[in-house]
């Protein structure tokens, strides 16, 4: 089935061509009410054992679906996701996302080994139809229905898997403002999901969901915020002290001295450096044998220091919007 919710002007026209060419294709034409609502409408007429979901701006490889289906032979597996790679690779932002998506995919595959794949991505994922229907379908109130349905599946003790060999290419934002909007939505949806399922924390020792997935995701949010606050506090104290201490300026004290860091071998600095080095090693391994190639340490350093530092911007904006209860822009 092809579902057109009028989110892309040309989608209906293209879908009709496919419907004319293939007898198995059926179009559901409806006004744009959000992806989750549209998927739920499609669920009402689907009677197959499995349902595959992909986005209009994504391009799965021909053998991707076949490579994913085999995972459902394992008992309890109710959703399988794919490896998402970047299709457009022209400007610097797009190239940074090439690295970003490769690392995300590699990290997600590692989580697969501990039954903790907590996102079945929108570009290409396959679900057991009966399970999704039993769970009430996709949550239309959540901005990231792919995250929410995955957590819902895990919360009832079922499994999710990732096929690293099943590849789908997606079109990523080429402009910074669009990148920020996308990541704000991701952060908002992630926070919504944590708030919805936090009561499962440390419940049912037989399920990894409450003992690993929730703490893992929640701690990632908290560490990012704490790191930002500590860094901001450092700059504020240093900046206020030196900028307003005229005696230092008159004596020739360097104006930007407050930006210098003290690299004394404190326990905090030691663990920070250790974490950074381990991250570089992780990224290096993530690029090995991937379609992005074996990236140089310099490129990984630039990615780690510059691009990853930008992550805090959409997170702060998401928290601000959440504090105002403003989710309207992202649900239009």
Which role fits each region the language model picked out?
Residues 1-31:
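Acidic donor-binding segment of Leloir-type glycosyltransferases
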Residues 2, 58-59:
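Acidic metal-phosphate-binding loop of nucleotide-sugar-dependent transferases
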Residues 5-6, 63, 74, 163:
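Acidic/polar residues in short coil/turn loops that connect beta-strands
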Residues 13, 19-23, 36-38, 42, ...:
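Long helical/loop segments within the catalytic core of UDP-sugar-dependent glycosyltransferases
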Residues 38, 149-150:
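Short, hydrophobic alpha-helical packing/hinge segments within bilobed ligand-binding/sensory domains
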Residues 72-108, 141-143, 150-215, 219, ...:
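Catalytic donor/gating beta->alpha subdomain of glycosyltransferases that bind UDP-sugars
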Residues 199-212, 239-332:
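Juxtamembrane C-terminal module of membrane proteins
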Residues 222-241:
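Hydrophobic, aromatic-rich transmembrane alpha-helices
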């Amino acid at each position: 089935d092809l579902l057109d919710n009028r989110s892309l002007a040309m989608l209906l026209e293209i879908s009709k061509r496919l419907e004319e060419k293939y007898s198995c294709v059926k179009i559901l034409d409806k006004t744009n009410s959000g992806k989750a609502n549209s998927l739920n409408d499609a669920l009402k007429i689907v009677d197959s054992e499995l349902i595959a979901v992909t986005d209009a701006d994504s391009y799965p490889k021909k053998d991707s679906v076949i490579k994913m289906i085999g995972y459902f032979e394992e008992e309890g597996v109710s959703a399988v996701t794919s490896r998402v790679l970047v299709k457009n690779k022209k400007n610097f932002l797009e190239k940074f996302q090439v690295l970003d998506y490769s690392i995300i995919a590699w990290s997600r595959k590692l989580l697969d080994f501990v039954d903790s794949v907590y996102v079945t991505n929108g570009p290409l994922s396959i679900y057991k139809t009966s399970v999704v229907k039993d769970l009430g379908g996709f949550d239309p109130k959540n901005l990231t229905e792919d995250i929410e349905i995955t957590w819902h599946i895990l919360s009832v003790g079922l499994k999710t898997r990732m096929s690293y060999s099943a590849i789908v290419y997606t079109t990523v934002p080429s402009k910074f403002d669009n990148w920020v909007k996308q990541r704000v939505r991701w952060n908002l949806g992630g926070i919504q999901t944590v708030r919805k399922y936090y009561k499962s924390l440390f419940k049912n020792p037989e399920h990894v969901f409450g003992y690993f997935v929730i703490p893992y995701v929640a701690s990632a949010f908290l560490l990012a915020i704490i790191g930002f606050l500590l860094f901001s506090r450092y700059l504020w104290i240093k900046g206020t002290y030196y900028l307003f201490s005229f005696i230092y300026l008159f004596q020739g004290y360097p104006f930007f001295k407050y930006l210098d860091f003290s690299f004394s071998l404190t326990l905090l600095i030691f663990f920070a450096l250790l974490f950074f080095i381990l991250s570089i090693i992780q990224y290096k391994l993530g690029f090995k044998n991937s379609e992005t190639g074996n990236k140089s340490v310099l490129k990984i350093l630039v990615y780690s220091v510059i691009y990853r530092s930008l992550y805090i911007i959409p997170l702060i904006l998401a928290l601000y919007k959440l504090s105002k209860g403003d989710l309207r822009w992202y649900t239009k």
